[in-house]
Amino acid sequence: MSQSTPYFRPSTHAQGLANYPHARTVRSPDGKGAYIYVSGTSSRRGDGTFVGATSNSNGTTTLDIRQQTAAVLSNIDEIIQGASNGRASIRDVVDATVFLTNMKDDYSGMNAEWNQIWSDRNTAPARTTVEVRALPRDEIIVEIKCTAYYV
């Protein structure tokens, strides 16, 4: 089935570390709408650098959950808009899974940025947040995968 469903892989975004698209679109059973399944998205830029990861002169890296979350949400919005030819946006997300590497330190900062997009819980998507041991790169402290629906 996945070979026959449209995929979206913007050339300006960072490409996945394995062979998968940024999103895949599936028409709804009634044919009137479509679901966009967005792959796990980080703050990685097209040039391979990361928003919210600053290298320090002593060799350490400062990681900022708010900057990373804002960048992730912006990247997701661009992916959804591209996959839908501008007919949908991040506001059409109906379900999301948030992966954090440090729930204790980063949950409130991630929520602060999340609430910038969805200030009303009645219009926010269903969401699950889980702590994971690691994400693909040490510079990544938040990753979000989601599903959007539009008509």
Predicted feature locations:
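N-terminal presequence-like segments and the immediate start of the first folded domain
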Residues: M1-S74, E78-V94, L100-V151
